[in-house]
Amino acid sequence: MGYYAFERLIPVVHPTAFVHPSAVLIGDVIVGAGVYIGPLASLRGDYGRLIVQAGANIQDGCIMHGYCDTDTIVGENGHIGHGAILHGCVIGRDALVGMNSVIMDGAVIGEESIVAAMSFVKAGFSGEKRQLLMGTPARAVRSVSDDELRWKHLNTKEYQDLVGRCHVALHETQPLRQMEENRPRLQGTTDVAPKR
């Protein structure tokens, strides 16, 4: 695992969290209960404190960083999509940040909000509860619908369930040379489907 102390500060990871072995956690990082940290995520707490609250997920290739005397926070059940960058910002409870989005210093994403994939949220942005944000720079285009929030909850639950599945069934191995006959397919734990 990539855990590094920095100036006597050691990352704190709740025993029920899952941190992929290729992820890197440096210094002042606090990871809560049931959190999922994906492959190649970088949580660099060498300036400001990084807090990932209970039930949140930080997916593959995400970056968290911030400035001194500030906290970068992902609230409870927050959902941070692949490749997103969070820098000195606050992501509200139950919010989703889409793939490859960038959230800058001092920005606050409101509870139950969704930031569309590939969006750029400017420094100092102050969002409200349940906004759909999109664009570069991102702006609020409408409220998040009940169906969208339900879809978000199902996706977040898949990652919360993945924590336990990874603790039990994920291990390093060697690849097969060819696909076996009748190879099974993996199943999720909810009926969530891709958004179209």
From Swiss-Prot:
Family note: Belongs to the transferase hexapeptide repeat family.
Listed name of the protein: Carnitine operon protein CaiE
Organism superkingdom: Bacteria
GO biological process, one term: carnitine metabolic process
Keywords carried by this UniProt record: Repeat, Transferase
Pfam families found in the cross-reference section: Hexapep (PF00132)
Chain residue ranges for the region called Disordered: 176-196
Molecular functions per Gene Ontology: transferase activity
InterPro entries found in the cross-reference section: CaiE, Hexapep, Transf_Hexapept/Carb_Anhydrase, Trimer_LpxA-like_sf
Function text: Overproduction of CaiE stimulates the activity of CaiB and CaiD.
Functional pathway: Amine and polyamine metabolism; carnitine metabolism
